[in-house]
């Protein structure tokens, strides 16, 4: 793919878009940037954009402008239904994302690509940690750490890439072919963008559409939707399950012990209770990580060592502090009901929950039922607070309170908590109504908890 002298339009000037622009510029393209946000809404990105881009358009771009470009790179946050992208498709101009662009210039074909509604970051990090014990050149990137495009020019044919990939990024691939494509689970999420579960599932399935007979598809047998994909998967299939399951290549649990069967050989790995990070969802993440590393010939002892010591990742049921016997956990990455339910189920102690945020169109019916069983009190904030409250009231749960800020939620949670209680931030919603992203929300939560430690807030 020769970029020199090409007019390339980058749509969406966030992290992924600017990373693509840097790469395009370095390879001799004339780079035009467009973002629907008004110019004054840009903060630190504005200076980067002005340095990188030959032309910039904010808010809107003239229709006739599309005739000037030979390639469009779209950021994952931009729906393909946006007018410039629809026009480009109609005119036969190629529209791809940053993942596809990076793949076309990537020297290595040792790519592990991991997607799923929940567990992506933890599993991606785990896979990276396991592989790094046996291989020198392992790069973990994508939605975690650096964008894929920022890592390829310092890589070689021997580099192993471990990518966290979202459904939005998978919408814009074309030739992207990982050695291993993994779908951890599929539950309702991003329905404001995908509209239906069928569309969402089809987007996730794209991770294995180009895998050949030398590659592997990893699927979760315990999730209804991914189980139904086993017969449709490309390449060699590796299945993981929390129960004993009969497949040629499988990672499973029997009598509380983890085993794998791969290429005709069955091995015991470890007792499931020896995994350091808590919760059934993290057991699934561990089984998936084992599945993704088997084709690389990883030793069983290496897997065991990592799973016994890996302490999890930031914003995923992250222990923050203990104050007067009250433990605070940051699960800001709980951006949908399924993730928040898994966080609630990870604890046996009484829970005081902080929930609510940006409305992605999910139902809170099932979530409310679990809250009623597991949670002493809920502090609700953000766009969805009334929606969640209505579901709680419908089933007769009245121990909730509206708050205006996260700081207020932390203070009031501490005031009503008792020795042995858990204060859990697991919003079951995205963060965009009050914060830039879930990372900022999680960091602010930790900051407020640490203020309690020092000042009593």
UniProtKB/Swiss-Prot annotation:
Show the GO cellular component annotation of the record.
Answer: cytoplasm
Which keywords, in A-to-Z order, does the entry hold? ATP-binding, Cell cycle, Cell division, Cell shape, Cell wall biogenesis/degradation, Cytoplasm, Ligase, Nucleotide-binding, Peptidoglycan synthesis
Provide the GO biological process annotations.
Answer: cell division; cell wall organization; peptidoglycan biosynthetic process; regulation of cell shape
Q: Which of this chain's residues are annotated to bind ATP? A: 116-122
Q: Which GO terms describe its molecular function?
A: ATP binding; UDP-N-acetylmuramoylalanine-D-glutamate ligase activity
Q: What is its main location?
A: cytoplasm
Enzyme class, one word?
Answer: ligase
> Which Pfam families does the record match to this protein?
Mur_ligase_C (PF02875), Mur_ligase_M (PF08245), MurD-like_N (PF21799)
So what EC number does this one have?
6.3.2.9
Catalytic activity field: UDP-N-acetyl-alpha-D-muramoyl-L-alanine + D-glutamate + ATP = UDP-N-acetyl-alpha-D-muramoyl-L-alanyl-D-glutamate + ADP + phosphate + H(+)
Q: In which pathway does it act?
A: Cell wall biogenesis; peptidoglycan biosynthesis
* Function as written in the Swiss-Prot or TrEMBL entry: Cell wall formation. Catalyzes the addition of glutamate to the nucleotide precursor UDP-N-acetylmuramoyl-L-alanine (UMA).
Question: Would you tell me the protein name for this molecule?
Answer: UDP-N-acetylmuramoylalanine--D-glutamate ligase
């Amino acid at each position: 793919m020769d970029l020199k002298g090409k007019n390339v339009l980058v749509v969406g000037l966030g992290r992924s878009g600017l990373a693509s622009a840097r790469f395009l510029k370095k390879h001799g393209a004339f780079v035009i940037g467009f973002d629907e946000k008004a110019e004054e809404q840009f903060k630190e990105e504005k200076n980067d954009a002005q340095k990188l881009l030959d032309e910039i358009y904010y808010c809107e771009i003239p229709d006739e402008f599309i005739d000037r470009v030979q390639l469009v790179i779209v950021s994952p946050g931009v729906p393909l239904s946006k007018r410039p992208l629809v026009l480009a498709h109609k005119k036969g101009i190629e529209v791809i994302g940053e993942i596809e662009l990076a793949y076309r210039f990537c020297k290595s074909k040792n790519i592990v690509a991991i997607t799923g509604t929940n567990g992506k970051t933890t599993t991606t990090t785990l896979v990276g940690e396991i592989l790094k014990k046996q291989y020198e050149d392992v790069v973990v990137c994508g939605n975690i750490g650096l964008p894929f495009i920022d890592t390829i020019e310092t890589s070689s044919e021997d580099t192993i890439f471990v990518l966290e990939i979202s459904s939005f990024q998978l919408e814009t691939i074309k030739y992207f072919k990982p050695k291993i494509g993994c779908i951890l689970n599929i539950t309702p999420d991003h329905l404001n963008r995908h509209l239906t579960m069928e569309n969402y599932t089809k987007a996730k399935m794209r991770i294995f559409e180009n895998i050949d007979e030398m590659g592997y598809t990893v699927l979760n047998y315990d999730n209804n939707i991914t189980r139904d994909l086993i017969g449709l998967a490309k390449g060699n299939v590796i299945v993981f399950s929390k129960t004993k399951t009969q497949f040629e290549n499988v990672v499973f649990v029997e009598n509380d012990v983890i085993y794998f069967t791969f290429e005709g050989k069955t091995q015991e790995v470890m007792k499931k209770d020896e995994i350091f990070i808590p919760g059934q969802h993290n057991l699934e993440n561990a089984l998936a990580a084992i599945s993704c590393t088997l084709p690389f010939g990883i030793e069983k002892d290496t897997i065991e060592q990592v799973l016994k010591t890996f302490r999890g990742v930031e914003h995923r049921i992250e222990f923050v502090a203990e104050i007067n016997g009250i433990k605070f956990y940051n699960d800001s990455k709980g951006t949908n009901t399924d993730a928040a339910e898994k966080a609630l189920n990870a604890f046996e102690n009484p829970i005081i929950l902080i929930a609510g945020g940006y409305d992605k169109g999910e139902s809170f019916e099932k979530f409310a039922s679990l809250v009623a069983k597991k949670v002493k009190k809920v502090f609700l904030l953000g766009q969805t607070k009334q929606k969640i409250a209505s579901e709680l009231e419908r089933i007769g749960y009245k121990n909730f309170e509206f708050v205006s800020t996260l700081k207020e939620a932390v203070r009031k949670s501490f005031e009503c908590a008792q020795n042995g209680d858990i204060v859990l931030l697991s919003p079951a919603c995205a963060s965009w109504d009050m914060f830039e992203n879930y990372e900022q929300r999680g960091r602010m939560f930790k900051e407020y908890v640490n203020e309690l430690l020092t000042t009593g807030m």
